[in-house]
Amino acid sequence: MIEYFTFKHRGESESFRDEVYLTLVPHVTVAVFYGSVMRTQTKVSPEMFSGLLAEVSSDADFNRMCSVLDDKLPGNAEYLVLRIEGSSIACFRHGGVMAKIVINGDLKMLPNGIFGLNDGDKILVATENFYSSLTDEGILADALVSDTCAEWMNLMVRRISDINQLKCGNLSAVTLLVR
């Protein structure tokens, strides 16, 4: 079973340009789109990203799904897609969205590829802006003292708020816990 918690915050920005996409059937698919960082004419709306992902997320082949996203999105689009099936996780990262995983008391960045999962593993998927006010030590400490995804997210958001009162632009993140 996968427990999850999502966080989306506009900050002082005029609009929310990021997107957090989550489906549970037929596979757990999580995607975070960093639309607020796109400053060129080839902007992709969060709705366009979600629509495209909805079309391809049911594809049984994760690599084919990622190839379609890579082909249809502009080169400067920043996003990360995770798919969890059974005891494995597939990760495809493009740009400033990262996934960090807590395994056996250690925090590691999740690179592109397919990896095994165990009960108790915790995963944070977030935009670069979300990570900018956090340290790896803080993320790990919050993960280790949290029993739920919501509690872990709340502790990290509190750390960000203590630094900038959440006036830092769009913040987008998802926490996942393997049970």
Pin down the residues of each PLM region.
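N-terminal entry segment of metal-dependent catalytic domains or homologous docking segments
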Residues: M1-A54, S88, F92, V97-G116
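Structural motif
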Residues: E3, V28-V30, G35, L80, I84, A90, A126-T127, ...
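Charge-dense, low-complexity intrinsically disordered segments
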Residues: R39, V56, A60, A143, ...
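Short amphipathic alpha-helical segments
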Residues: Q41-M48, D61-M65, T148-W152, M156
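Catalytic core of PPM/PP2C metal-dependent serine/threonine phosphatase domains
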Residues: L53-V102, I160-V178
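C-terminal catalytic subdomain
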Residues: L69, N118-L124, N129-R179
